[in-house]
Amino acid sequence: MVRSSASLGEDLTMQDRLRFQTLDSYQVAKEIARRVHVAKISDSELRDQATRASKSCFLQLCEGLPSESAAMRRKYFVCANGSLHETVGAVDLAVTLGMMSEEHGDAIQALALRLKAMLWRLRR
C-alpha cells in the first residue's frame, strides 16, 4: 500500500488518491510495469528496454488521463500505446530467447491485451 509522506504511518485509501489512480487502465498499466520489473529479464539491454517501455506506457497514461484537452489525451494515449507495443515486443523476444520465464511473459501479454483495448477506447 502507498504511504503518504504528509501523514507518516497512515495508509492511503482509495478516497485519498487522485481520481485517475482508481481507474482500471491505471491499475493494469502499473501492474504491467511491476511484472516487467519482477521478471528480471536476464539480458541487461533487453531488460532495460522492456523496463523503460513499460514505465513510459504507464507515465504517458498518467499524463493523459487527467487532461481535459481531447487532443492532449489522444497524444498521450497514442504514445502509451506505442510504448505498450514496445514492452510486448521486448517481453516476447525475452521469452523466445530464454531470458525470462514463459509464465511471466504470458501474464504480461494478457495484461497488455486488456490495456490495449482500454487505450483504444480512451483515444476516441
Briefly describe each language-model feature range.
Residues 1-124:
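Amphipathic alpha-helical assembly/interaction segments
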